[in-house]
């Protein structure tokens, strides 16, 4: 068996085409969605991510607002940039590119974001609304995972899903998304401290690997025909490495690779959050 690839690049491209039409409709009504970014420091990876986000904006017609701060920016400098974007009517939503340089309090910065402009869906208020199943911007990577599965016709209703990773950006909120009535999956949240991880993953219909441990999920840990999504990212001397070993493709029914799987979907959902915020402003 060779797994069918869940192609995040192609799916994200299709979503951007759909967003072009929605943005054109907004512009026709005098509303220009704007995405802001706050980037602190000189990390090449962070700069590449931000450039990619603004390329996406240009493609679909979303205005770009960049605030680049030096590596020695203080906590007050970063919070001032957040306050400026909170107050800027041209900014529909914005993100603070993480990680921030050492010495800066990321949580405090994120808490300063206006929840209505939280394009990443990671403000504590919005995560709380997700728990309460109230409408709010959704975390981009978990939303991208669900959207990718839906677009390939992978049924979530009643599915046994094992999520490996307990981070705030993926693991924890993904479980909340998957257990909504609209998805109705049954979720087991595992992590690097889980005893006999393979026993959990082998019984899963869907495995989402988001622990940040290279090669954590191997083919003997996956049931034949299961759906596997590789979301973990670790920087090594050889480049970015995911959590799923290459041999998993021999047994899985579907595989979302890394790179090229969930990453492009995360960026597409960022744009979607901004467009939806602009649409809400008209209602």
Swiss-Prot record:
One of its GO terms (biological process) is tetrahydrofolate interconversion. CDD domains: NAD_bind_m-THF_DH_Cyclohyd (cd01080). It catalyses: (6R)-5,10-methylene-5,6,7,8-tetrahydrofolate + NADP(+) = (6R)-5,10-methenyltetrahydrofolate + NADPH; (6R)-5,10-methenyltetrahydrofolate + H2O = (6R)-10-formyltetrahydrofolate + H(+). Coiled coil: none annotated. Signal peptide: none annotated. Its EC number is 1.5.1.5, 3.5.4.9. Pfam families: THF_DHG_CYH, THF_DHG_CYH_C. It comes from the Bacteria. NADP(+) binds at residues 165-167, 192, 233. Pathway: One-carbon metabolism; tetrahydrofolate interconversion. Keywords: Amino-acid biosynthesis, Histidine biosynthesis, Hydrolase, Methionine biosynthesis, Multifunctional enzyme, NADP, One-carbon metabolism, Oxidoreductase, Purine biosynthesis. GO terms for cellular component: cytosol. InterPro entries: Aminoacid_DH-like_N_sf, NAD(P)-bd_dom_sf, THF_DH/CycHdrlase, THF_DH/CycHdrlase_cat_dom, THF_DH/CycHdrlase_NAD-bd_dom. SUPFAM superfamilies: Aminoacid dehydrogenase-like, N-terminal domain (SSF53223), NAD(P)-binding Rossmann-fold domains (SSF51735). GO terms for molecular function: methenyltetrahydrofolate cyclohydrolase activity; methylenetetrahydrofolate dehydrogenase (NADP+) activity. PANTHER family: C-1-TETRAHYDROFOLATE SYNTHASE, CYTOPLASMIC (PTHR48099:SF5), C-1-TETRAHYDROFOLATE SYNTHASE, CYTOPLASMIC-RELATED (PTHR48099). Belongs to the tetrahydrofolate dehydrogenase/cyclohydrolase family. Catalyzes the oxidation of 5,10-methylenetetrahydrofolate to 5,10-methenyltetrahydrofolate and then the hydrolysis of 5,10-methenyltetrahydrofolate to 10-formyltetrahydrofolate. Homodimer. This is Bifunctional protein FolD. The lineage of its organism: Bacteria, Bacillati, Actinomycetota, Actinomycetes, Streptosporangiales.
